[in-house]
Design a protein with these regions (language model features):
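A short beta-turn/strand-edge loop motif at beta-sheet boundaries
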Residues: 49-54
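Beta-strand signatures of extracellular beta-sandwich domains
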Residues: 56-60
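Low-complexity, acidic Ser/Thr/Pro/Gly-rich terminal tails and inter-domain linkers that flank the onset
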Residues: 1-43, 47, 122-126
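Short, solvent-exposed, Trp/other aromatic-anchored flexible loops in extracytoplasmic proteins
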Residues: 48, 63-126
Length: 126
C-alpha cells in the first residue's frame, strides 16, 4: 500500500529573523495522494525565555518555477504553552489554497507570550 502523503518540498532548516523569539526549525510541503490536496507543515522552536501562547505565520504558495500563486495566507497556532527550546506546530497541517503549490516561503509575523506581551516581525527577513 502506498503512502498517504508525498513530500513535495522542504524548507531550509533553522530559518531565523534577527530579534525573533522563534526559529522555523523545519518546514515541508506534502501532497495528499488520495485527495490531491496540498498542505504545509512547520516546526517552530521557541528561543525566548518567555513562554509562548500563540503565534501567527505567513505562507506564500509558489508554483514549480517559484512564482507566487496569489496572496500569502496566515495561519495561527493557538492555545500553546511553549517554553524555551521546545517545538510546536509540527502536527498542524496548513491547507494550501492552490493544489498546484510546489514550494513556499514562510515567515513568523507575530508571537504572543503568556504575559500578553507581543512581538511583531515588522520588516524582519526570514
Amino acid at each position: 500500500m502506498s503512502e498517504r502523503y508525498s513530500k513535495v518540498f522542504s524548507l531550509s532548516e533553522n530559518l531565523y529573523a534577527e530579534g525573533a523569539p522563534v526559529v522555523i526549525a523545519a518546514g515541508a510541503l506534502l501532497k495528499d495522494n488520495q485527495t490531491g490536496r496540498v498542505v504545509a507543515q512547520l516546526k517552530l522552536r521557541n528561543i525566548s525565555p518567555k513562554t509562548i501562547k500563540a503565534a501567527t505565520v505567513s505562507i506564500l504558495s509558489l508554483n514549480t518555477v517559484g512564482n507566487p500563486l496569489g496572496e500569502a495566507i496566515r495561519y495561527e497556532y493557538l492555545d500553546l504553552s511553549s517554553t524555551r527550546d521546545t517545538d510546536f506546530g509540527s502536527k498542524s497541517a496548513i491547507p494550501m489554497p492552490d493544489i498546484t503549490t510546489r514550494s513556499f516561503n514562510a515567515a513568523v509575523v507575530e508571537v504572543i507570550f503568556a504575559d500578553n506581551s507581543i512581538w511583531n516581525a515588522s520588516e524582519a527577513v526570514w
